[in-house]
């Protein structure tokens, strides 16, 4: 690649979605190099919401952020929730709504999993909080700490004092997966908002919009497979969609599972059906096949549980199956992750449905 092209790609990455829109549609689709010689923007970035009203899911929590944006007086906030649910995006949308053109000068964004030590609080954060920035009346500078639960205890202790000292000029917005890893003194200084995983229907609605805009050929079972592999994570869903389209040019379940490479739910479904029929030999053949393909016990047991939840079977039997799957998952998580454990699970599932032996 020419040096000029390398510089252009680096500048585009720094500029973000706004620069992508200026370059035009031919430069921003997909993930492989286009004929024009430009690299294409990941769809996760291209379709990242710019306004709070565009954020998918968690309507109640997002509506609270919209109230903050409208009134202008934002408290320090912590947004906690699983990955890919829009925590950082929501904070950026809030900052954009509050600060408008001053966004570039008045926002400091740090990823706390990299900048996690006490030096960052003492240097970067403190220096930014001390800077004088001209802002509209009633607005504050915003410091965004992504993955704040990765910060060391020492850094968090130093941060709480900084939050108090600069409370007149600066607001802190923390995004984390688990709020219990944030120390109590910081939690008490913040409004804690919680995000949940997105529902299948919410992910499907956004996927349909994107495949329409990008003119992606797809089948219904292909989108179902993407939703199944995403597990409520919108980022994962968009990455899987783009990877499948870039690799195969067509979205169907077969192509999706080639890209995502996890135990195929149809195979798992067939295995559960054999267990319901008390056919241990056929069930074990499928398990041995999955094992030979190199899937870890965590992958297999996770998919067995997810398929079992939606499997059509008597309710009492489903409860028994899920109980046994849970016990086996616990043993695997503790490190006893052999094929024998998985085979034992199949034997116990078959035992639940087998006719009692004649006395």
Swiss-Prot record:
It is found in: Nucleus. One of its GO terms (molecular function) is DNA binding. InterPro entries: AAA+_ATPase (IPR003593), ATPase_AAA_core (IPR003959), DNA_pol3_clamp-load_cplx_C (IPR008921), DNA_Rep/Repair_Clamp_Loader (IPR050238), P-loop_NTPase (IPR027417), Rep_factorC_C (IPR013748), RFC_lid (IPR047854). Residues 1-11 have a biased composition (Acidic residues). Its main location: nucleus. It comes from the Eukaryota. GO terms for cellular component: DNA replication factor C complex; nucleoplasm; nucleus. Keywords: ATP-binding, DNA replication, Nucleotide-binding, Nucleus. GO terms for biological process: DNA repair; DNA-templated DNA replication. SUPFAM superfamilies: P-loop containing nucleoside triphosphate hydrolases, post-AAA+ oligomerization domain-like. ATP binds at residues 81-88. Residues 1-35 are annotated as: Disordered. Residues 12-25 have a biased composition (Basic and acidic residues). Signal peptide: none annotated. Subunit of the RFC complex, an heteropentameric complex consisting of a large subunit RFC1 and four small subunits RFC2, RFC3, RFC4 and RFC5; the RFC complex interacts with PCNA. Forms an heterotetrameric complex with RFC3, RFC4 and RFC5; this complex has ATPase activity but is not stimulated by PCNA. The heterotetramer of subunits RFC2, RFC3, RFC4 and RFC5 interacts with RAD17. Subunit of the replication factor C (RFC) complex which acts during elongation of primed DNA templates by DNA polymerases delta and epsilon, and is necessary for ATP-dependent loading of proliferating cell nuclear antigen (PCNA) onto primed DNA. This subunit binds ATP. Belongs to the activator 1 small subunits family. This is Replication factor C subunit 2.
